[in-house]
Design a protein with these regions (language model features):
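Short helix-capping/linker segments at secondary-structure and domain boundaries
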Residues: 16-22, 53-57, 105-113
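Terminal helix-to-tail segments of small alpha-helical proteins
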Residues: 9, 18, 59-67, 124
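Active-site neighborhoods of divalent-metal-dependent phosphate/nucleic-acid chemistry enzymes
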Residues: 71-112, 117
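Residues that scaffold the ATP/ADP-binding catalytic core of kinase and kinase-like folds
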Residues: 14-16, 50, 122
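PIN/NYN-family metal-dependent endoribonuclease catalytic core
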Residues: 6-7, 25-54, 65, 70-73
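Acidic, PIN/NYN-like endoribonuclease modules and their adjacent C-terminal/linker elements
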Residues: 2-4, 107-136
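Metal-dependent nucleic-acid phosphoesterase active-site entry motif
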Residues: 1-20
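A generic structural signal for short hydrophobic patches within well-formed alpha-helices
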Residues: 12, 44, 119-120
Length: 136
């Protein structure tokens, strides 16, 4: 089991929105990877936007309960994040994805819960697969 579970906006939205295609998958993953789940502010911004006014209270509750925790400070890792975004400009890599990949480089035993497939393309420390769990 991973020591640091990271979540992207896709997982959060899938978990909180019954209308999301990946909702059953996210609900099944949640107990297997118990909170707290680490994330970054960029991923939260995406999640709040995608959830809209109906889903925002549920995400706010996760934050208040500290089930989802921001453990990343962009200012401290700005150059590394910008370098990742430049490297993967053809994908393209979002700010949230770059922050999460950087988190996998700095946190011990990380895994990302994500509904996306881009993390299969990205590499941590330039050559290592980013550990992630996806719906496949």
């Amino acid at each position: 089991m991973a020591g640091n579970v990271l979540v992207d906006a896709g997982f959060v939205v899938a978990l909180l929105s019954r209308r999301d295609t990946h909702h059953p998958w996210a609900v099944a993953q949640a107990p297997q990877f118990a909170p707290p789940w680490n994330t970054c502010e960029a991923a939260l911004s995406e999640a709040f936007h995608l959830l809209g006014t109906h889903g925002a209270p549920a995400l706010s509750a996760l934050l208040r309960r500290r089930s989802v925790v921001v453990v990343f400070e962009l200012a401290a890792d700005l150059e590394s994040v910008l370098m990742l975004m430049r490297k993967y400009v053809s994908v393209p890599m979002s700010l949230a994805d770059a922050c999460l990949v950087r988190m996998t480089e700095t946190l011990a035993d990380p895994v990302i819960l994500t509904t996306g497939t881009d993390f299969r393309i990205y590499r941590r420390h330039s050559r290592h697969v980013v550990p992630c769990v996806t719906p496949d």
